[in-house]
Amino acid sequence: MFEVTTIDAHVAGGAVRLVTAGLPQLTASSLEERQQLLSERAGPVLAALAREPRGHSGVVVVVLTEGDTPDADAGMLLFRSSGAAAACGHAIIGATGLAITRGVLTPRRHGTVRYDTLAGRLTATSIVLAGSGPVPVRYTGPAATVLQPNMPVNIGRRALRTDVVWSGTELVAIVDAEAAGVPLVSSRALELQRAGADVIRHLDESIRLTHPDTGAHLSVALAVFIGPAPESGMDIRSGTVRADGTVEHTPSAEATAAIAAVLSAMGLMPIGRRLVHQGLLGTTLFATILAMGDAEGRPTVDVEIGGEAWPTGDHVFRFEEADPLLSRD
C-alpha cells in the first residue's frame, strides 16, 4: 500500500486537486520530459485520482514541479480523467490559491506566481485575505485571437455559424445557444453534450487550423454555447462541452478568454471593461482585456481571467497494488 496526499478546492464549481506528496521525484531537464516521466511512473495513480471512485470526470489533478525558465516560480503539470492536459484556467486559479495559502510554494514576488506550463507562461496573482473562505486569484496567459469568425457548422439539420477562437491555450468554437436549439440549463446536459460533439466533429472534419505561433495542427477542444445571462450583473451565460465529451457546468476559463476575444473583435469589449461570465451552475468567472496587439495581421488580446478558489478538503488517498482500478485504461 502507498499513499498520496492532496489539497482540494473548487473554482466556480470546477474541481481542482493539488498533489502535495506521494508521487515519484522527477529529475528531467524540461517540463515535457517531466510530464512523460510522471505519466510513465505514476500514470495509473494520476488516473485514479481523477476518476471514480476517488474522483470524477470534472477533476483536474495538478502537480507542481521545477520550472523550465530561470524566473519561473514553478512548473505546472495537469492531468484529467482523459489524460494529460496542457493548461486549465480553473487549475491555475485553484492551485494558486491553495499553494499560496498553504505554503506549498513561496513565490519570489509576494502574491504573484509565474508558472511554466506546456501551453506557455501563465502568471497568477492572489491577494490572500485574513481568515477562512475563498481566495481571489487572477491570471494572464498567452494572447487570444479569433482564427475563423462566422464559420458554417451543422448541428443535425440546423445550419449555424460559429466563431473559432484560439483562447491562448486551447481551440474553442463558440455557438449561439438559441440558434442551436440548446437550453442553457444543467438538466438538459445530454442535449448540450450531443450538440457539442456535433460541432467539434464537424469542424475537425471540415477545416484545418494551426497554432498561431508554432504552426502545429489544432483540434477543437471546446464547443461553447452562449446566450444572455438571466440574472442582472451577468453578461453572458454558457454551457461548454469538451472534446472528450465532458459537459462543464462551470464557466470554463478558456471559454471566458475566447468570448472576450470575440467581443473585442466585434468592438464590444474595450480595454479595461470587465466581462462577467456565468456557467450552468450559476457561478461566475470574469475577464478583463489588458492589451490589444497584432500577430501576422490578426488582432490579438491579452486577457486576464479571475475567480475564487474555495478550499474543500485535505485528503490522504490510499492505493493497494492489487486494486483492479489501478490497471484499467
Where are these regions (language model features)?
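A glycine-rich beta-to-alpha transition motif near the start of alpha/beta enzyme domains, typified by
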Residues: 1-152, 176-329
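Catalytic core of DAGKc-family lipid kinases
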Residues: 147, 160-162
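Internal, non-catalytic "lid/hinge" segments that mediate substrate recognition, gating
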Residues: 153-157
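Internal alpha/beta core interface subdomains
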Residues: 163, 167-182
